[in-house]
Amino acid sequence: MDHLKRQDEKVFAAIEAELGRQRSKIELIASENFVSEAVMEAQGSVLTNKYAEGYPGKRYYGGCEHVDVVEDIARDRVKEIFGAEHVNVQPHSGAQANMAVYFTILEQGDTVLGMNLSHGGHLTHGSPVNFSGVQYNFVEYGVDAESHRINYDDVLAKAKEHKPKLIVAGASAYPRVIDFKRFREIADEVGAYLMVDMAHIAGLVAAGLHPNPVPHAHFVTTTTHKTLRGPRGGMILCEEQFAKQIDKSIFPGIQGGPLMHVIAAKAVAFGEALQDDFKTYAQNIINNANRLAEGLQKEGLTLVSGGTDNHLILIDVRNLEITGKVAEHVLDEVGITVNKNTIPFETASPFVTSGVRIGTAAVTSRGFGLEDMDEIASLIAYTLKNHENEAALEEARKRVEALTSKFPMYTDL
């Protein structure tokens, strides 16, 4: 970044500081990952200069012959990975992908059945502070009070009672496998569309390690980062019958020109996801998550649903007599990055919470293995149990430094 360093020292310094943070801390935020240098090169390419409103072969600007190739590569690779009939890779985010689906099939005030945010859903699945909850009549389903797993009989009962036009499956903090086939059966029984938001598990689905929602859902949305390990962005997969409507909802419906440099980075990441070593990577994510969950439980920590089937773990910190906010802060102080998170049947404010959400996608990208999960579990428990003991926190910092020093990253930057 020689040009940036010479031209804008302040921005360069901030980026360098962030690189230092990523290198020196243990990244456990479940929605984050470390992309390859190839993905970063594509995103930092000259494609950032090109406007390309429209779609390949049907642009509103000239000079799009090369970016057309890039977008076609991205779309074709997604079809190969997930078996989708139609793909739109232009959404700038997962939220915009969800918005486009809503705009395609819903009218203002239509009833939608979505997962309660504190039970593991997402803001765009009907939260009253989000456009989705403002524009549409969302009815919530959740998890069982004892098992903390989705109660499909309750989903069916609510669907029969409220007759939604759309059912939304998928979550941002649900550590268990989702039965997409069952969701489609429920949707068919009440005459609803089914949309699956697979943002968190897309990489696991790509590797064949989580059931694929594409054969069951009318629409599938996802981000392109998280477990898929691409740049920050979104995409939509759908049945061919909805292709024109979905494309129109994205452009000109809710977006103008696509970010062609980001689409290039998406294409590179999708190419990586087609390789055999990506399947190994995804399996390691799950293995690490299971090992970490076991370690946390051995340390006496409480896990929502009692464990995990994917990359994600939700810790209930109430038995430690602290809040999620305190837990996030003290873990960050010793070099472990997590996020506070609501838990099912939450009683605390979303700014405080009773839980912490962690995930293994980023540490697995870095090369951490099973024995390292044992150390991370020990570190988390030790830090939370001694959150007011500065000597203990200093000891934890040293252990974090010793662990991260074993796994250098982005050494060419």
Swiss-Prot record:
Q: Where does (6S)-5,6,7,8-tetrahydrofolate bind?
A: L117, G121, H122, L123, E239, S349, P350, F351
Q: Any idea where this protein resides?
A: Cytoplasm
Cite a single GO BP annotation: glycine biosynthetic process from serine
Q: Name one Pfam family in it.
A: SHMT
Q: Where is this site: Plays an important role in substrate specificity?
A: H225
Asked whether the UniProt record includes Membrane among its keywords, one would answer no
Reported EC number(s) for this entry are: 2.1.2.1
List the Gene Ontology MF annotations in alphabetical order.
Answer: glycine hydroxymethyltransferase activity; pyridoxal phosphate binding
Q: Which SUPFAM superfamilies match?
A: PLP-dependent transferases (SSF53383)
UniProt keyword list: Amino-acid biosynthesis, Cytoplasm, One-carbon metabolism, Pyridoxal phosphate, Transferase
Required cofactor names: pyridoxal 5'-phosphate
Gene3D superfamilies cross-referenced by the UniProt entry: Aspartate Aminotransferase, domain 1 (3.90.1150.10), Type I PLP-dependent aspartate aminotransferase-like (Major domain) (3.40.640.10)
What does it catalyze? (6R)-5,10-methylene-5,6,7,8-tetrahydrofolate + glycine + H2O = (6S)-5,6,7,8-tetrahydrofolate + L-serine
Task: State a GO cellular component annotated for this protein.
Answer: cytosol
Main location as per UniProt: cytoplasm
Pathway the protein contributes to = One-carbon metabolism; tetrahydrofolate interconversion; Amino-acid biosynthesis; glycine biosynthesis; glycine from L-serine: step 1/1
What NCBIfam families does the annotation carry?
Answer: PRK00011.1
The family line of this record is: Belongs to the SHMT family.
The subunit structure is: Homodimer.
* Function description: Catalyzes the reversible interconversion of serine and glycine with tetrahydrofolate (THF) serving as the one-carbon carrier. This reaction serves as the major source of one-carbon groups required for the biosynthesis of purines, thymidylate, methionine, and other important biomolecules. Also exhibits THF-independent aldolase activity toward beta-hydroxyamino acids, producing glycine and aldehydes, via a retro-aldol mechanism.
Q: What is this protein called?
A: Serine hydroxymethyltransferase
Q: Which gene does this sequence derive from?
A: glyA
